[in-house]
Amino acid sequence: MGRGKVQLKRIENKINRQVTFSKRRSGLLKKANEISVLCDAEVALIIFSTKGKLYEYATDSCMDKILERYERYSYAEKVLISAESDTQGNWCHEYRKLKAKVETIQKCQKHLMGEDLESLNLKELQQLEQQLENSLKHIRSRKSQLMLESINELQRKEKSLQEENKVLQKELVEKQKVQKQQVQWDQTQPQTSSSSSSFMMREALPTTNISNYPAAAGERIEDVAAGQPQHVRIGLPPWMLSHING
């Protein structure tokens, strides 16, 4: 037969209760020492009997050190729990505020769109109308400003294009002028070149005069002795002249 589960309850018999306390206390102190030695743990055990007698155990007999450490830990834990509780409360409060603000904004947006106006009275409708008129004024003012800026930008571009056009027209006129001068120069250049070549050739080949030379064979000596000199003009042949003028 297996051992059944023992129900824990207060021992009514005073003597039996005292004997049980003595046995369990000794076993508890022994277990505290074992866990301290085996597991290198800091253990502090405090027991008060029904008569108020103190029984204690502390690792390395440093009860004050362990209790001080316990107090620091307990205080830090309490502060952390308190801070978390305050933070959670603040977050809940902030959430409620933001939620109400979002609902108000959504409601105002619907009113501006002309929706859900049944809940508004005459004064609220007048305020809404004034708000819409002010909004329209700001919108129109901004629209006019943008249109004016656009017009100024177009005028600036127009002026820039006009200046570029003037520069291009000036360059075109100069180019046409140069081309006209070039054509005129090309037309006059052949005549000037021909006249210069003919003049230079005539200077290089002057007319040759032959006089006072002895008579060639077959001529009459009397004609020579008569004292009349013979002048012979030697000119260029026609083919050479046509070549020079050509």
Swiss-Prot record:
May interact with the K-box of MADS1 and MADS6. Gene3D superfamilies: Transcription factor, MADS-box (3.40.1810.10). It is found in: Nucleus. CDD domains: MADS_MEF2_like. Keywords: Developmental protein, Differentiation, DNA-binding, Flowering, Nucleus, Transcription, Transcription regulation. Probable transcription factor. May be involved in the control of flowering time. Its main location: nucleus. SMART domains: MADS (SM00432). It holds the Pfam family K-box. GO terms for cellular component: nucleus. This is MADS-box transcription factor 14. GO terms for molecular function: DNA-binding transcription factor activity, RNA polymerase II-specific; protein dimerization activity; RNA polymerase II cis-regulatory region sequence-specific DNA binding. Highly expressed in sterile lemmas, at intermediate levels in stamens, and weakly in lemmas, paleas and carpels. Residues 88-178 form the K-box domain. Signal peptide: none annotated. SUPFAM superfamilies: SRF-like. It comes from Oryza sativa subsp. japonica (Rice). GO terms for biological process: cell differentiation; flower development; positive regulation of transcription by RNA polymerase II; regulation of transcription by RNA polymerase II. Residues 1-61 form the MADS-box domain. PROSITE patterns: K_BOX, MADS_BOX_1, MADS_BOX_2. Residues 180-199 are annotated as: Disordered.
